[in-house]
A protein has these predicted regions:
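Terminal transmembrane helix and immediately flanking juxtamembrane interfaces
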Residues: 1-40, 44, 100, 117-145
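Membrane-interface loops
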Residues: 19-89, 102
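Membrane-embedded catalytic cores of phosphoryl/pyrophosphoryl-handling enzymes
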Residues: 62-145
Length: 145
């Protein structure tokens, strides 16, 4: 989130661009929240998969509830949604930074034993799809990204 705040209030941006950046950032966060707390949460209710560390009878490397479903990864969903929205809206530097972050977060969550690789890949797919839909909806409505 600190990256998004810096993106909004970078000393290099012109005051006229602030409104566009704020709207773009708002839509990116809306996409990420809808993907994570809407689509991913709904899927978790219908497909409650055990986390790897719980399945293997191990202790978690990070503080994670073993009873909470692992599929799909909420972290992967959220960060991929942000990355894809910014990439689609033409903010390549920020988009690629968030894309690399999404990949690193996904790898770290698998390494920590709190997600299966398929949890991460599903999260990435959901995040990308929701951001694509939100971007297209607002592009067609005449709102300029």
């Amino acid at each position: 989130m600190a990256v998004l705040l810096f993106y909004l209030w970078s000393p290099k941006i012109k005051k006229a661009d602030l409104k566009t950046r704020a709207a773009r950032t708002g839509l990116a966060v809306l996409s990420a929240l809808a993907a994570r707390f809407g689509v991913a949460a709904l899927i978790r209710n219908f497909y409650p998969r055990e986390r790897p560390f719980a399945f293997e009878g191990l202790d978690s490397l990070i503080n994670q509830n073993p009873l909470e479903a692992s599929f799909p990864s909420g972290h992967a969903t959220f960060f991929m949604a942000l990355a894809v929205y910014f990439l689609l809206s033409g903010q390549k530097k920020l988009g690629y930074f968030l894309l690399i972050s999404a990949v690193l977060i996904g790898v770290a969550r698998v390494a920590a034993g709190v997600h299966w690789p398929s949890d991460i890949m599903a999260g990435w797919a959901i995040g990308a799809a929701v951001s694509f839909v939100v971007f297209k909806l607002f592009s067609k409505s005449g709102w300029r990204n």
